[in-house]
Amino acid sequence: MPVDQEYIYSLLRKYKDRTATEAEKEELVSWYRQRAERDSVFPEDEHVVAESMRVRLHHEITRPQHDRRRQWLAAASILLIIGVSVGLYLRPTAGVDPGDITPGSHQAMLVLVDGTKISLTEAANGNIASQENIQITKSGDGQLIYTLAPNRQGTATASGYNTIETPKGGQYQVVLPDGSKIWLNAYSSLRLPLNFSEGAERRVELKGEAYFEVSHQPTRPFTVVSGQHAVQVLGTHFNVKAYADEPDIKTSLLEGKVRVTAGTHSVTLAPGQQSRLAEGNITVAEIDTREAVAWKEGYFMFDDERLEDIMRSVARWYDVEVVFDNDALKEETFGAVTTRFTRISTLLEIMEQTGDVQFRVEGKTIHISSKQPV
């Protein structure tokens, strides 16, 4: 029997006003799950952001849920989306604030071995450089493709490194001659050898964060180096997060097997595990790998994360500075799932509805303070 639309809107208003009972919240979650199977919850042309979040969350809640906490996060995120959506639905329609901060996009700089800089943001699609035995091509969907020149297959004459740098607010994908794919996150850099011929060492250097899908070649290990930290694989899918402004380096394994070394320490990871290098020591823990690679899939996924850690990711993606009114706010924790491709005002509204903090945007600076009682 169809649920009365006016009744649902009354529940939505209660939830928005924080007067909904636990039973009413459960009813909203049940209703949302049923609607998510058929169509969008609100008119798509008016609520693109809500729909985008709905699609992402639908992927999460339809997967098997064995962990009680994971079930809670999914339900809480549904209510979060409902809350934001109804807020958008109930408030008067207004134009987009021209001062609002837009999300990141495909942006990067390619620095050739001779120091030449090529803006991948501005360069036309097609061949952008030829060096020794490789050709470098830019595609129209944010990819930089390395291929061996047809007359140089199997040779190993080139030497030196090119570097790909993403700014704050940028990301890019690289395809190597061996078929390996690398997704580079915001404010990161990747040094790539010119020589990827057969027999050459497959070794790259990373600062920042990247996701790797390495083609399997039993006789040619693939090594990712970040300072004194190294990950060696034969063929696998994994994520490395090695930002200079973070206290640790994290390697998360999705498929295959990797070996992580740092100094005299070494560990081997199995799928679903994450190594953490901090103060010279490596620890290993079981994780939900979806959180580690959410950025690569186009969304933020926070599960009881510290606000300071969350805002580091936000600052890199939106190219903003973050100021906390007091250090205690850095320890606030949040859990949410939301698209990365929305204006920052929407993201901050989501976070305000799920925590005890409030945000004030001044230019490219976000000020965070305690939420004032109503």
Name each model feature, range by range.
Residues A23, D39-V41, L80, G154, ...:
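Amphipathic alpha-helical interaction segments
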Residues P2-L11, K25-V29, R33-P103:
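Membrane-interface anchoring determinants
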Residues T19-A20:
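Charged, low-complexity interaction regions
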Residues D67-A74, S85-V374:
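A residue-level detector for the "anchor" residue at the start of short, highly conserved motifs
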